[in-house]
């Protein structure tokens, strides 16, 4: 065969290889699907809580000067939003926490544009009414985390206007009282929490401009120290399992849990900020304490969104893609972890 023919064949092979479609490894699979937009204004730094099969989302910031007090109920069975009773106008805020305890929703702490807050409110689905409860005893703050387990609610970490915090408090709705509890992790704000099997997981966040990398689980059934440290979320160990942990660390992220996937029961962490606003998504396996990269969030890079989950389904709602009112989102996305990414289905 002549040198000319060899060159022609090699050139054709290079063209054919370069024209092959890009494929995503299985570890980067999963598909994002657009669902019904929030009926209210676009916003970021809103809160949400789940009661039964419904998600409740409200408060937040319009990117300019307005904090919201409105609240909305999402029914995933019919993919629709309906407005419920707003919080009092005086309770408008952003960067608060939302949680649920025994069929009631709670919202507390946050920022109203002028002051950091420590007030605490209860929502009753039966009366469609808000009632002010005992103020959060940890002091005014925003960008904290909150969750409910069993008969109690918990709020901790955050920023008080001067410093990042690491304290945690337990709320007893039957007595309307707060009790301080220990937390073994680092100070942080703009972290996330999620619940699985009556345990709370706290991860990500930032302190003094540094993204934190420690990861903790809270088990209220344990005696003594209820917190257990899990594997760090960066390339921290001398082993190889975390060599690819390039951008799990972040702030202002969203998280949710989906049970019964092909890979078991999983948590997902997506969006947020890591030097810039990002779209990367990671899967956490409760059984192995390991993370795997999944398909990027298909909306614009987003920060300050609400991650939530109803039975076997996970969602990300609202958030911002930049500065100003036009960058505030009213979108809702659902993540399908067992699906193959299709970038053309939205």
Q: Which sequence ranges carry the predicted segments?
A:
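Kelch-like beta-propeller repeat domains
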Residues: 19-346
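Sec-dependent bacterial lipoprotein signal peptides
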Residues: 1-17
């Amino acid at each position: 065969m002549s040198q000319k023919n060899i060159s022609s064949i090699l050139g054709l092979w290079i063209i054919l290889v370069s024209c092959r479609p890009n494929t995503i490894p299985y570890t980067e699979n999963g598909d994002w699907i657009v669902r019904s937009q929030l009926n209210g204004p676009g916003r970021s730094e809103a809160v949400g809580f789940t009661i039964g099969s419904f998600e409740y989302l409200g408060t937040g910031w319009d990117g300019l000067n307005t904090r919201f007090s409105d609240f909305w109920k999402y029914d995933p069975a019919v993919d629709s939003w309906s407005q419920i009773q707003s919080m009092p106008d005086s309770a408008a805020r952003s960067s608060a926490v939302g949680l649920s305890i025994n069929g009631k929703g709670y919202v507390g702490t946050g920022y109203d544009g002028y002051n950091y807050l420590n007030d605490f409110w209860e929502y009753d689905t039966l009366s469609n009414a808000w009632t002010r409860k005992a103020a959060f005893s940890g002091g005014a703050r925003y960008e904290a985390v909150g969750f409910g387990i069993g008969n109690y609610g918990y709020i901790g970490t955050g920023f008080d206007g001067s410093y990042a915090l690491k304290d945690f408090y337990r709320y007893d709705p039957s007595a309307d009282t707060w009790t301080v509890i220990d937390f073994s992790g680092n100070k942080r704000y703009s972290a996330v929490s999620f619940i699985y099997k009556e345990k709370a997981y706290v991860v990500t966040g930032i302190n003094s401009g540094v993204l934190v990398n420690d990861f903790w689980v809270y088990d209220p059934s344990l005696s003594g120290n209820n917190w257990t440290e899990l594997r760090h979320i960066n390339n921290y160990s001398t082993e190889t399992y975390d060599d690819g942990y390039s951008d799990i660390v972040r702030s202002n992220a969203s998280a949710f849990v989906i049970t019964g996937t092909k890979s078991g029961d999983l948590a997902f962490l997506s969006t947020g900020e890591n030097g810039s606003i990002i779209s990367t998504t990671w899967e956490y396996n409760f059984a192995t304490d390991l993370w795997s990269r999944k398909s990027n969030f298909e909306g614009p890079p987003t920060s300050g969104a609400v991650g939530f989950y109803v039975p076997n389904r996970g969602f990300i709602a609202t958030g911002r893609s930049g500065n100003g009112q036009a960058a505030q989102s009213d979108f809702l996305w659902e993540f399908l972890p067992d699906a193959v990414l299709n970038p053309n289905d939205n």
